Amino acid sequence: MKNWKKITLITGAVCTILGFFLLIFGLFAGGIQYLTSTDLGSFNNSDKSAAKVQKLVTEELSPYKNLDVSLDSLNLQVRYSKANTYALSYKNTKTSKTKSTTPITWSQSGNTLKIRERNLKKHTWFHIDLNFLICIFGNDDEKEAVSDEDMVTLYIPKNAAFDQITLENNDGNLLLNNLRTSQGIIHVDDGDIIFKNCALRNTLLTSNDGDVLSTATTYSGNTAITCKDGDVLFYRAADVLKPLSLKLETNDGEIIVPSSFSGKVKEKDDKSTYQQNGRDGYGTLSIQSEDGDIVLHA
């Protein structure tokens, strides 16, 4: 082996070993806690000396029956509370010892909770993302703190049921768990909508650019899903959808349903349709996709 190649190989090996020991030392010296609380890549033109530290804020809420949420770029998550209470959490960005930036405004009036995303001043910034280190070396609480970044989380009791929900998001995802409502309007412009263990009745759902995923979710009344550019995927769907009247249509995609369903998929040119007559007393679910598949997994 040539001398310069040997020197390069030895130098690389030494740097790799040294870097590994420095990484381990940094982790045990409090590096994970630093990563969870500090944005290493933020350079705010208006205040370059201020480190921007994200703090997870949790607000206790009174019980409510109506939910009205409008967000621009934040993700919204609804999940049941281990304490069986109502709460709201979000990341608060601290710019100095005395100043902080709250990404949302919220209010409760009567039985209605209203949440709005603030129109914050935009700054030029460069971001260094080292959150993968937290996912590898962090504990469960630290991993959850990372997952809450750019996320508004609503905690609700397991048996909570809403009379009316209105959820709108321009450029973010909706992750809805254990959400039950008698009536609802859900719209996402550019993002995915994910349901799990939900119960939706008389709900109108629209998505311009993103997928809709539903797992173990029941539908009743008259519910409609319209997706312009994205797939509509149902999992664990046979038991919950088989009794319903189904109207499925896609202009540029496939329709796949379990073989146990009574209807038949019809195809003509690029258009596919499926219709199923449900049992008396059960609701109707209509799904229309302009450019995407509709797949019902048993």
Residue ranges and their predicted role:
Residues M1-K82, W125-H127, L133, F137-D140, ...:
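Alpha-helical transmembrane segments and their membrane-interface anchoring/capping motifs
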Residues K196-S207, D211-A298:
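Short, surface-exposed interaction patches in beta-rich subdomains
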Residues L71, K97-N111, F234-E249:
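Generic detector of contiguous secondary-structure segments
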Residues K52-N66, N75-A83, K99-L200, L213-S214, ...:
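Right-handed parallel beta-helix
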Residues L76, Y86, T102, D163, ...:
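Short beta-strand/loop motifs in extracellular/secreted proteins, especially
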Residues A83-T95:
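Short Gly/aromatic-enriched secondary-structure transition segments
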Residues S81-T85, S182, D239-V240, S262-K264:
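A short, sequence-level motif marking secondary-structure junctions
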Residues L71-S73, N92-K94, K121, D171, ...:
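Beta-strand elements of well-folded, non-transmembrane domains
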